[in-house]
A protein has these predicted regions:
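Hydrophobic alpha-helical membrane segments of integral membrane proteins
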Residues: 27-70, 107-166
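Membrane-interfacial helix-loop-helix
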Residues: 2-33, 73-130, 137-140, 169, ...
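Glycine-rich loops and low-complexity Gly/Arg-rich segments
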Residues: 142-144, 172-173, 184
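Hydrophobic core segments of alpha-helical transmembrane domains in multi-pass membrane proteins
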Residues: 178-182
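Alpha-helical transmembrane segments of multipass membrane proteins
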Residues: 1, 40, 44, 75, ...
Length: 203
C-alpha cells in the first residue's frame, strides 16, 4: 500500500502515519528526502539544520544521519561544480567580503586542504552555502572535496538527528539524550580547539 499525502496528514496521528509510510516505502521516502534537500540547500539556501531535524524525526538516528550527510554532500558537490564552471568572477567578490574564508581558502601559506575543509565544516564562522560555492574556485580536487565534506559533516549532523530522535521517537530516551550530549560536547570542544589554533592565527 502506498500512502498519499492526504492519507498521511488525515486524522490526528499524522506523525505516526508519516513514520509508517517511511517504513513501508523506505527507498521512495529516502529518494524524495535526498532530492528535496539538494534542491532546497543549493537553490533556496535552506539551512541544513532544518533537514537534519526532519531526518532524525522520520528516519531515526542512524539512517537519518546517513541520508542527511549524503544529501548535504550531494548538494555541496552541485554548488562546488556551479562555482567552478559558472560563477568564478562573481564568487571572488563575495568571498572577499568574508575575511575568514578568503584567507583560509586562498592564502598560499594555509594549512593542507583537508585541514581547511575540517575547519570550515566544524567552526561556525563560515556561511555554509557560500563555502560550498567558494571551494569551486580553489585548487582542491572534486574527489578530495567530496570525501572531506562527507566525513567532516557527520558530527554536526549527528548532533541534530540523534537529538531529534531522542525527543521524538526513542524508546530509550536517556540513552539517546546522553549520546546527544556527548556529541555536542565533542563538537564544541573540537570547534573551539580548531578556532583557537587556526582561525585566531588568521585574524
Amino acid at each position: 500500500h502506498y500512502y498519499g499525502w492526504s492519507d498521511i496528514f488525515s486524522g490526528d496521528d499524522w506523525y505516526g502515519n508519516l513514520q509508517q509510510m517511511v517504513k513501508t516505502n523506505f527507498l521512495q521516502a529516502a529518494l524524495i528526502y535526498i532530492v528535496v534537500m539538494m534542491i532546497a540547500s543549493v537553490v533556496l539556501a535552506v539551512p541544513g539544520v532544518t533537514f537534519a531535524i526532519i531526518a532524525g524525526a522520520i528516519f531515526g538516528p542512524w539512517w537519518g544521519t546517513l541520508l542527511c550527510v549524503l544529501s548535504a554532500t550531494l548538494g555541496a558537490i552541485a554548488a562546488f561544480l556551479i562555482g567552478r564552471f559558472f560563477l568564478q568572477d562573481s564568487l571572488r567578490d563575495q568571498i572577499a567580503k568574508n575575511r575568514y574564508i578568503s584567507r583560509l581558502l586562498f592564502d598560499k601559506n594555509t594549512k593542507n586542504e583537508m585541514m581547511v575543509l575540517m575547519i570550515t565544516r566544524l567552526v561556525p564562522l563560515f556561511p555554509y552555502n557560500l563555502q560550498n560555492f567558494a571551494y569551486g574556485i580553489t585548487d582542491i580536487s572534486l574527489g578530495k572535496y567530496s570525501l572531506g565534506t562527507f566525513v567532516f559533516m557527520i558530527p554536526g549532523v549527528a548532533m541534530y538527528t540523534v537529538g531529534t530522535y531522542a525527543l521524538t521517537g526513542a524508546s530509550n530516551k536517556l540513552l539517546y539524550i546522553g549520546l546527544t550530549a556527548a556529541i555536542v560536547v565533542a563538537v564544541m570542544v573540537l570547534s573551539k580547539t580548531l578556532r583557537k589554533k587556526y582561525v585566531s592565527e588568521e585574524e
